[in-house]
Amino acid sequence: NNSRTLDIIEQNKDFLDIENVINGQGGAFSFVSCAMKDNIGEVSQGDAIKRRMIFINSFNNAYSYKVVIIDFRLFCFNQMGRINKSKNKLTMKHSKNITSWSKHLPEYIAQNRDDLQESIEQFRAMKKVELKGTETLREIFLHSLADKLKGQITDKRTKEKRNKTINDIDKEWSEVKNNYYRDNDFSLYGALNAITYQQTHSEGRILDENKNAMNRYQSLIAGPCGNRIDIARERCLALTR
């Protein structure tokens, strides 16, 4: 199926440029990341957002064969959210014919090329909402990483089971706050970037950073990191209304 994916991309080379191909778990799955040509918009001068199309394939049924559209901030390569509206979904079961499925791709690419401006306008709306202190940042952070606070853990001091608290994700919260103050953009857009930077570049507690990076990459495209960024984006957008 990888060769077919590359054939499909070649057929659409006027619109797509392959950026990288990543194989994981000894070839059990692959992600083929493509830039969508001439598909860049600016939130403000020098702050560009680019849209990517990622083909996901697996040979162990971990993933359906599908295409994911993701917005990226070029300034820092933050993942800024997956485009999950119904018109942006293109998924197939492995039992179906990929060649037949791919006939829908040109129309799908056209939809998403035209749709980028909607994302840009959303980010601009976030940038107009100024924040004071870190109360709103903290609320968005807790809302976005709520999955990390589910369940119980054994307290290191008392050795008894207890519910998780924000103290158990203090590393993540410290990273988000540091990102927020470093960027010096005290707006909803700045809050979103603080969280997306942490999830894109810092998330993970494995000492081996190479493993961390691979785990993050998978998680950003089709896992918890991507989910948290999507939740943060939706929450920030809701606060602009």
Q: For the regions a protein language model found, what residue spans apply to each?
A:
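Amphipathic alpha-helical segments
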Residues: N1-E19
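Beta-rich nucleic-acid/ligand-interaction surfaces
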Residues: E19-I40
